[in-house]
Amino acid sequence: MRILLSNDDGVHAPGIQTLAKALREFADVQVVAPDRNRSGASNSLTLESSLRTFTFENGDIAVQMGTPTDCVYLGVNALMRPRPDIVVSGINAGPNLGDDVIYSGTVAAAMEGRHLGFPALAVSLDGHKHYDTAAAVTCSILRALCKEPLRTGRILNINVPDLPLDQIKGIRVTRCGTRHPADKVIPQQDPRGNTLYWIGPPGGKCDAGPGTDFAAVDEGYVSITPLHVDLTAHSAQDVVSDWLNSVGVGTQW
């Protein structure tokens, strides 16, 4: 199995290095990751400037100023030959649950892999300690995929409780929960008296009930949420069409 491995925490982050070491025991792994932390970069792609890469002695490749999406795009289309069989993103330092997937560079890297035609996993740890647990879970899933491919055409967003492996209760297939809207902005002043702003933390849990990714992780289970790229709200199409007809928009300008 040939694996393109990326992340959004940066090429030297403990999550990606722990996972790379574990994956290399049974797979051909090429790390292509940002040279620095790009958390929250979502699906951003660098279009107005060039990208420079640096290859380390162990073969890992850092993309200078690159986003997670840049890294996967370059990895698939230029840097990994032959091309990968699958794209894996992670292990992220912290969860990507509920609405987090909108902003997550970890999920975005997997999404880019799927967009380019490859199976893809995004892996996150609900903390900053037991990366070995998340690596073991990921390796188990990848070995299973190698034996029997999962042909859903979906991204698997995997969130692992920050627990020792022997305390993980199992795996649940889940849906995304939701958070309350975030509203924290932290102002500061620089030495010249100019105001700076820091984006605050994400909102608290809103829908974290049974069946959600939040609930699974809170209860000690690995959460696997299938995600797809099509953002169309199919159930709303008729509602929007009826509204347009009722208000007359489009019949005259």
UniProtKB/Swiss-Prot annotation:
Function: Nucleotidase with a broad substrate specificity as it can dephosphorylate various ribo- and deoxyribonucleoside 5'-monophosphates and ribonucleoside 3'-monophosphates with highest affinity to 3'-AMP. Also hydrolyzes polyphosphate (exopolyphosphatase activity) with the preference for short-chain-length substrates (P20-25). Might be involved in the regulation of dNTP and NTP pools, and in the turnover of 3'-mononucleotides produced by numerous intracellular RNases (T1, T2, and F) during the degradation of various RNAs.
Subcellular location: Cytoplasm
Cofactor binding comment, as recorded: Binds 1 divalent metal cation per subunit.
Keywords for the protein's UniProt record, in alphabetical order: Cytoplasm, Hydrolase, Metal-binding, Nucleotide-binding
Lineage: Bacteria, Pseudomonadati, Pseudomonadota, Gammaproteobacteria, Enterobacterales
Enzyme class: hydrolase
Positions that bind a divalent metal cation: 8-9, 39, 92
Molecular-function GO term, any one: 5'-nucleotidase activity
Pfam hit, one: SurE
NCBIfam families from the UniProt entry: PRK00346.1-1, PRK00346.1-3, PRK00346.1-4, surE
Organism: Escherichia coli O17:K52:H18 (strain UMN026 / ExPEC)
Protein name, per record: 5'/3'-nucleotidase SurE
Catalytic reactions on record: a ribonucleoside 5'-phosphate + H2O = a ribonucleoside + phosphate; a ribonucleoside 3'-phosphate + H2O = a ribonucleoside + phosphate; [phosphate](n) + H2O = [phosphate](n-1) + phosphate + H(+)
Gene: surE
GO cellular component labels: cytoplasm
Obligatory cofactor(s): a divalent metal cation
InterPro entries named in the record: SurE (IPR030048), SurE-like_Pase/nucleotidase (IPR002828), SurE-like_sf (IPR036523)
Enzyme Commission no: 3.1.3.5, 3.1.3.6, 3.6.1.11
Family per record: Belongs to the SurE nucleotidase family.
